Design a protein with these regions (language model features):
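Bacterial N-terminal signal peptides that target proteins for export
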Residues: 1-13
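C-terminal segment of classical bacterial N-terminal signal peptides
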Residues: 16-26
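N-terminal active-site segment of His-dependent metallophosphoesterases
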Residues: 24-90
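Active-site glycine-centered loops adjacent to acidic/histidine catalytic or metal-binding residues
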Residues: 39, 75-76, 116-117, 210, ...
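Short active-site segment of divalent metal-dependent hydrolases/proteases
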Residues: 42, 78-79, 119, 213, ...
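Extended active-site neighborhood of metal-dependent phosphoesterases/phosphodiesterases
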Residues: 47, 83-201, 224-229, 234-243, ...
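His/acidic metal-ligating clusters that form di-metal
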Residues: 58-70, 105, 110, 161, ...
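Short, solvent-exposed aromatic-acidic interface loops
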Residues: 294-304
């Protein structure tokens, strides 16, 4: 499906780029430049991981060059089916999560990470309240995220302000006692409304959370979870009320772009070690304008399967070796979607350019007011 879509929209993307899109190498020094890559890795990948490092060096080089200000990640960094006891959670997160974070720290890259279901032990961990709580404590302790969010999600829900851009990271999982729910609770919503009001002068607002809200979405190698309540949820209604522009999410390991109520929901990310067609997003923000691009590239796998994946079948694991496909090596990633949002004199946001994944059949002008 991805290849057919790319073929159909390839010409539109080329025309879009020729029409004046500013490639990252030509971006202005004052631009805010970032990338987004959810669901990497979604497997227990060590640092270093034999057979992976050349491909990862290539990819992290791109993230660092194209998004020097920060990288967004909407969760699921490891498989993390560590359900034995809290001691196992502590031991394994210290091994794998700190290794993941070190990849960014070694390059002096800033990452803003939202918890995915795998940051609570996957769906199985979310069903065991005390195990999920142990994961949450470790996330707060180890991952080093901003601690300006609500007390019950400290270090897991937070915001950052970069010039005219507000970026909010949410935890789409709530402690409900015996198990965790797939929702955003009242404490987060109250904090979120205060954050929106305190930053009402932001020209653009991006929110990231692991679970998509508006369906249906494409899905592969995923439990296909969605936020409870969908577009009728308190979260969606609050984002509409305060003029959120973009909601970034993952979970489904496929690309789906939807626009509803003035919000662009972008589901993306892919399963490294299993899927051969991978993707990421890059963006830039300057006064009155935000540009987003979706990029895809291909890899190849070989060898056996990486161990240390409890509660998995013999082949339900990542492959031992990852290599860039020949075309990826020679040509780099291909742009398969591009979007430019511009703020007009009346405060409304116009879709001034769109192509590929973003070419949805909707009116070009979004009159959702900026709050």
């Amino acid at each position: 499906m991805i290849r057919r879509f790319t073929f159909q929209f390839g010409a539109a993307v080329v025309l879009f780029l020729c029409g004046g899109f500013l490639a990252s190498e030509e971006s202005r020094a004052e631009d805010i430049r970032f990338t987004s890559v959810p669901d990497i890795f979604n497997w227990n990948i060590s640092n270093p991981q034999s057979g992976w490092e050349d491909a990862l060096d290539w990819f992290f080089d791109r993230l660092q060059k194209e998004g020097p200000d920060f990288t967004l990640n909407a969760g699921d960094i490891m498989d993390a089916r560590w359900w034995d006891d809290e001691a196992q959670v502590k031991r394994k997160t210290e091994e794998y999560w700190t290794g993941f974070k070190k990849r960014f720290d070694d390059r002096k890259m800033t990452i803003y990470l939202a918890p995915g279901d795998h940051e609570y032990g996957d769906d199985g961990g979310l069903k065991i309240g005390h195990i999920a709580r142990a994961f949450g404590k470790q996330f707060t302790r180890l991952m080093g995220m901003p601690k300006n969010g609500p007390a019950n999600h400290i270090g897991r829900t937070f915001f950052v302000r970069k010039g005219n851009l507000l970026v909010v990271t949410l935890d789409t999982f709530e402690d409900q006692g015996k198990r965790f729910g797939y929702t955003v609770g009242k404490e987060q919503l109250a904090w979120l409304e205060k954050t929106f009001k305190a930053n009402r002068d932001a020209e653009f607002i991006i929110v990231q959370g692991h679970l998509p809200i508006v369906g249906p979405v494409r899905s592969k190698n995923s439990s296909a979870s969605m936020l409870k309540g969908g577009a009728n949820s308190g979260l969606w209604k609050l984002m509409v009320k305060h003029g959120v522009n973009v909601y970034l999410c993952g979970e489904h390991h496929r690309i789906t772009v939807k626009k509803r109520d003035g919000i662009w929901q972008i589901v993306h990310g892919a399963l490294w070690g299993t899927q051969t067609d991978l993707n990421y997003l890059r963006g830039s923000v300057r006064p009155k304008e935000m540009t987003l691009e979706l990029l895809e590239f291909d890899v190849e796998y070989s060898g056996g399967y990486i161990g240390d994946h409890p509660h998995r079948g013999a082949k339900s694991k990542p492959r031992e070796n990852v290599d860039l496909a020949a075309k990826t090596k020679s040509e780099g990633p291909r742009v398969t979607g591009a979007l430019v949002l511009s703020v007009g004199s009346d405060g409304s946001v116009e879709v001034t350019k769109a192509a590929g994944w973003f070419e949805v059949k909707l009116p070009k002008k979004d009159t959702t007011p900026r709050k």
